[in-house]
Amino acid sequence: MLSLVLLLGIRIWMVNRGIESPEVVQFEMGEEAEIGRNIFNDRVENMNGYSVTAESARIMTYEDYLKKYGYNEEEDGVLFEEDNMLRPEMIYEVDILVKNHNKEDNTGCGISYSDYKLTASDFMLSVSSPLYWIANDIAEENQNLMMSFRLRPESEMRFHLPFYFAPGSPAESVSEETVRDADLQLVLSLYPEQRQIRIDETE
Protein backbone atom coordinates (compact mmCIF):
# COMPACT_ATOMS: atom_id res chain seq x y z
CA MET A 1 0.00 0.00 0.00
CA LEU A 2 2.80 2.37 0.91
CA SER A 3 4.55 1.65 -2.38
CA LEU A 4 1.38 2.52 -4.32
CA VAL A 5 1.08 5.85 -2.51
CA LEU A 6 4.75 6.53 -3.19
CA LEU A 7 4.39 5.69 -6.89
CA LEU A 8 1.31 7.90 -7.15
CA GLY A 9 3.19 10.77 -5.51
CA ILE A 10 6.09 10.37 -7.94
CA ARG A 11 3.69 10.28 -10.89
CA ILE A 12 1.95 13.50 -9.79
CA TRP A 13 5.33 15.18 -9.28
CA MET A 14 6.52 14.16 -12.76
CA VAL A 15 3.33 15.46 -14.40
CA ASN A 16 3.41 18.77 -12.53
CA ARG A 17 7.11 19.18 -13.23
CA GLY A 18 6.34 19.60 -16.91
CA ILE A 19 3.76 22.32 -16.33
CA GLU A 20 5.11 25.83 -16.53
CA SER A 21 3.45 28.49 -14.41
CA PRO A 22 2.35 31.49 -16.47
CA GLU A 23 4.27 34.71 -16.12
CA VAL A 24 2.30 37.22 -14.04
CA VAL A 25 2.04 40.71 -15.53
CA GLN A 26 0.81 43.14 -12.89
CA PHE A 27 -1.12 46.36 -13.49
CA GLU A 28 -2.50 48.93 -11.08
CA MET A 29 -5.80 50.80 -11.19
CA GLY A 30 -5.70 53.60 -13.74
CA GLU A 31 -3.19 51.73 -15.91
CA GLU A 32 -4.27 50.52 -19.33
CA ALA A 33 -3.77 46.75 -19.51
CA GLU A 34 -3.48 45.49 -23.07
CA ILE A 35 -4.55 41.86 -23.31
CA GLY A 36 -2.66 40.99 -26.49
CA ARG A 37 -2.74 37.34 -27.55
CA ASN A 38 -3.29 36.02 -24.03
CA ILE A 39 -6.29 33.83 -23.27
CA PHE A 40 -8.19 32.23 -20.40
CA ASN A 41 -8.83 28.60 -21.35
CA ASP A 42 -9.46 28.19 -25.06
CA ARG A 43 -7.03 28.78 -27.91
CA VAL A 44 -9.87 30.05 -30.10
CA GLU A 45 -10.29 33.04 -27.79
CA ASN A 46 -9.21 36.27 -29.44
CA MET A 47 -8.94 39.41 -27.32
CA ASN A 48 -6.01 40.81 -29.28
CA GLY A 49 -6.29 44.58 -29.70
CA TYR A 50 -8.45 45.04 -26.60
CA SER A 51 -7.39 46.73 -23.39
CA VAL A 52 -8.95 47.11 -19.94
CA THR A 53 -8.48 49.92 -17.42
CA ALA A 54 -9.92 49.62 -13.90
CA GLU A 55 -11.06 53.15 -13.04
CA SER A 56 -12.83 52.87 -9.68
CA ALA A 57 -14.18 50.36 -7.16
CA ARG A 58 -16.45 50.29 -4.13
CA ILE A 59 -18.22 47.90 -1.75
CA MET A 60 -21.93 48.30 -1.06
CA THR A 61 -24.88 46.31 0.16
CA TYR A 62 -27.21 44.52 -2.25
CA GLU A 63 -30.00 46.95 -1.35
CA ASP A 64 -27.83 50.01 -1.99
CA TYR A 65 -26.77 48.55 -5.32
CA LEU A 66 -30.37 48.16 -6.49
CA LYS A 67 -31.14 51.68 -5.29
CA LYS A 68 -28.13 53.07 -7.17
CA TYR A 69 -29.45 51.73 -10.48
CA GLY A 70 -33.11 52.46 -9.78
CA TYR A 71 -34.25 48.84 -9.59
CA ASN A 72 -37.30 48.13 -7.43
CA GLU A 73 -37.90 44.41 -6.90
CA GLU A 74 -41.56 44.97 -5.98
CA GLU A 75 -42.19 46.74 -9.29
CA ASP A 76 -39.54 45.28 -11.60
CA GLY A 77 -39.43 41.70 -10.36
CA VAL A 78 -37.55 39.72 -7.72
CA LEU A 79 -34.02 38.89 -8.86
CA PHE A 80 -33.18 36.29 -6.21
CA GLU A 81 -35.45 34.32 -3.92
CA GLU A 82 -34.50 34.37 -0.23
CA ASP A 83 -33.30 30.75 -0.32
CA ASN A 84 -31.28 31.20 -3.53
CA MET A 85 -27.64 30.30 -2.85
CA LEU A 86 -26.58 32.90 -5.43
CA ARG A 87 -28.42 35.72 -3.66
CA PRO A 88 -25.87 38.49 -2.98
CA GLU A 89 -25.59 40.32 0.32
CA MET A 90 -22.67 42.56 -0.62
CA ILE A 91 -21.37 43.84 -3.95
CA TYR A 92 -17.80 44.74 -4.87
CA GLU A 93 -18.39 46.90 -7.94
CA VAL A 94 -15.50 47.58 -10.30
CA ASP A 95 -15.84 50.18 -13.06
CA ILE A 96 -13.72 49.46 -16.12
CA LEU A 97 -12.99 51.11 -19.45
CA VAL A 98 -12.64 48.71 -22.39
CA LYS A 99 -11.01 49.83 -25.64
CA ASN A 100 -10.77 48.15 -29.01
CA HIS A 101 -7.60 49.43 -30.66
CA ASN A 102 -8.07 47.37 -33.84
CA LYS A 103 -8.49 49.42 -37.00
CA GLU A 104 -10.57 46.81 -38.83
CA ASP A 105 -13.63 44.89 -37.70
CA ASN A 106 -13.08 41.25 -36.71
CA THR A 107 -16.17 39.22 -35.86
CA GLY A 108 -14.02 36.63 -34.08
CA CYS A 109 -12.45 39.13 -31.71
CA GLY A 110 -14.05 40.31 -28.47
CA ILE A 111 -14.29 39.94 -24.71
CA SER A 112 -16.35 37.77 -22.37
CA TYR A 113 -16.79 38.57 -18.69
CA SER A 114 -17.81 34.98 -17.90
CA ASP A 115 -14.19 34.22 -16.91
CA TYR A 116 -13.64 37.43 -14.94
CA LYS A 117 -13.00 36.92 -11.22
CA LEU A 118 -11.78 39.01 -8.33
CA THR A 119 -9.21 36.67 -6.83
CA ALA A 120 -7.44 36.62 -3.48
CA SER A 121 -5.10 34.04 -1.98
CA ASP A 122 -7.91 31.95 -0.52
CA PHE A 123 -11.16 33.00 -2.22
CA MET A 124 -12.55 34.45 -5.42
CA LEU A 125 -15.62 36.52 -6.30
CA SER A 126 -17.69 36.10 -9.46
CA VAL A 127 -19.80 38.54 -11.46
CA SER A 128 -23.54 38.37 -10.81
CA SER A 129 -25.22 38.18 -14.22
CA PRO A 130 -28.59 39.72 -13.19
CA LEU A 131 -26.85 42.63 -11.47
CA TYR A 132 -24.55 43.09 -14.46
CA TRP A 133 -27.56 43.37 -16.77
CA ILE A 134 -29.13 46.02 -14.52
CA ALA A 135 -26.00 48.14 -14.10
CA ASN A 136 -25.12 48.10 -17.79
CA ASP A 137 -28.70 48.49 -19.05
CA ILE A 138 -28.66 45.25 -21.05
CA ALA A 139 -31.97 44.65 -22.83
CA GLU A 140 -33.75 41.43 -21.89
CA GLU A 141 -33.51 40.02 -25.42
CA ASN A 142 -29.71 40.33 -25.24
CA GLN A 143 -29.21 38.74 -21.83
CA ASN A 144 -28.44 35.34 -23.33
CA LEU A 145 -25.14 36.72 -24.65
CA MET A 146 -23.49 35.59 -21.40
CA MET A 147 -21.69 38.92 -20.92
CA SER A 148 -19.82 38.56 -24.21
CA PHE A 149 -19.41 41.43 -26.65
CA ARG A 150 -17.21 43.10 -29.22
CA LEU A 151 -16.68 46.80 -29.80
CA ARG A 152 -16.49 48.68 -33.06
CA PRO A 153 -12.92 49.29 -34.25
CA GLU A 154 -11.16 52.16 -32.49
CA SER A 155 -13.93 52.62 -29.94
CA GLU A 156 -14.30 52.35 -26.18
CA MET A 157 -17.02 51.68 -23.60
CA ARG A 158 -17.37 51.71 -19.82
CA PHE A 159 -18.81 48.78 -17.88
CA HIS A 160 -19.78 48.13 -14.26
CA LEU A 161 -18.79 44.67 -12.98
CA PRO A 162 -20.73 43.58 -9.84
CA PHE A 163 -18.74 40.90 -8.00
CA TYR A 164 -20.86 39.49 -5.20
CA PHE A 165 -20.39 37.81 -1.84
CA ALA A 166 -22.62 36.76 1.04
CA PRO A 167 -21.13 36.92 4.57
CA GLY A 168 -24.21 35.22 6.00
CA SER A 169 -24.22 32.28 3.59
CA PRO A 170 -23.18 28.94 5.11
CA ALA A 171 -22.06 27.73 1.68
CA GLU A 172 -19.92 30.64 0.47
CA SER A 173 -19.27 32.66 3.59
CA VAL A 174 -16.59 35.32 3.30
CA SER A 175 -16.73 38.31 5.63
CA GLU A 176 -16.75 41.93 4.53
CA GLU A 177 -13.62 42.53 6.60
CA THR A 178 -11.83 39.67 4.81
CA VAL A 179 -12.73 41.12 1.42
CA ARG A 180 -11.64 44.64 2.39
CA ASP A 181 -8.30 43.41 3.75
CA ALA A 182 -7.50 41.09 0.82
CA ASP A 183 -5.06 41.75 -2.01
CA LEU A 184 -7.63 41.47 -4.79
CA GLN A 185 -6.74 40.96 -8.43
CA LEU A 186 -8.98 41.35 -11.46
CA VAL A 187 -7.63 38.62 -13.74
CA LEU A 188 -7.79 39.44 -17.46
CA SER A 189 -6.07 36.33 -18.87
CA LEU A 190 -4.34 33.14 -17.70
CA TYR A 191 -2.08 31.94 -20.54
CA PRO A 192 0.63 32.34 -21.63
CA GLU A 193 0.70 35.41 -19.40
CA GLN A 194 -1.55 35.95 -16.41
CA ARG A 195 -2.43 39.61 -16.80
CA GLN A 196 -4.14 41.12 -13.78
CA ILE A 197 -5.07 44.44 -12.19
CA ARG A 198 -4.75 45.05 -8.45
CA ILE A 199 -8.11 46.37 -7.21
CA ASP A 200 -8.48 48.81 -4.31
CA GLU A 201 -11.53 50.67 -3.08
CA THR A 202 -11.61 54.22 -4.39
CA GLU A 203 -14.79 55.36 -2.62
Language model segments and positions:
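Conserved functional micro-motifs across diverse proteins
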Residues: 1-203
